[in-house]
Amino acid sequence: MAKPPFPHPPSMSLALLIDLDALAHNYRTLRSGLKRGTHCGAVLKANAYGMGVREVSMRLYQEGCRHFFVAHLSEAIELQCFVPKDIYIYVLNGLRKREEKVYGHYNLIPVLGNLDQIQRWNAFSKTQKECFKAALHFDTGMTRTGLPPKDVAKLELSDFSNTEILCIMSHLACAYQAPHTMNETQRDLFDKLRKRFPFALASLANSGGFFLGPKYHYDIVRAGLALTGSYAAIFQIKAPLKPVIKAYAQILQLNEVSAGDSIGYDATFIASRASRIATLGVGYADGYLRSLSNRGEVYFSGTRVPVAGRVSMDLMTIDVT
């Protein structure tokens, strides 16, 4: 594989390459594993997992994606700038106070996770004399956000007199551990709770839930990490997904060291033989974790080589002997 061209003279020593064709392949692969009528949604939190929400959302829209999920209101507003209006944008972290008018103005879908949010959203809809869309998040075991079962039992249809409940969702806590009994427990509770809203779409599966099989897919699967192609490698699952993200760093210096020489802070790496050490212009400030010191690996000319010594803020060293 040819190295990517760096600007000349180079303005930075790290380049992140996003393969949009691989992204599209992954989306099509996931969608092909769903039954007819089930939507493959895309989770584009945190700037689309760092890939760039503009380019990623536009390509996924071209591939047919119409259900998009983000974490925060600001992300939803930004996303809306890049794709046509015939989409659904869900804001997973819920409706904060005094945000109602903004959601209404941009026609965004808050994922309501407690009784106060439900009351405020319906009251706002009444004042606007409109019926705004919303999703409901039921907590079936993740215990972070969402309505606990005791609060779901309190819900009445009158609570939604001016609200269109588009989707009922929950989130699997152990989807990345396929045999875990909690997956089935959460699914059973989700089935029980959503019976009160038979007219709404249902969404339970995240990327991990997709690989649990059709019983977890329902109407919308929320694909996030799987879109990047890294899911299969991280969790050792056989899936025809392609890596989307590749990071390239420049070599700033090559050093010939002798047996017994130390490398980097705290001399945590001692060369056991005559070695060739390359210094890269990337470090933990760029997101390469300090915890990978003396543990991580990178590719050098197509070969995996070990990190040698501490990862520092903007430099790291690798053994290319």
Q: What does each model-found stretch correspond to?
A:
Residues 11-12, 46-51, 58-63, 104-106, ...:
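Active-site loop/helix belt of alpha/beta enzymes
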Residues 1-109, 164:
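A charged N-terminal "starter" segment
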Residues 299-317:
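A C-terminal functional module that forms or caps the active site or interfaces directly
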Residues 69, 90, 111-112, 169, ...:
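Conserved beta-strand positions in the central sheet of alpha/beta enzyme cores
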Residues 247-294:
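Functionally critical, mid-to-C-terminal surface segments that flank or help form catalytic/ligand
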Residues 217-218, 309, 320:
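Hydrophobic structural segments
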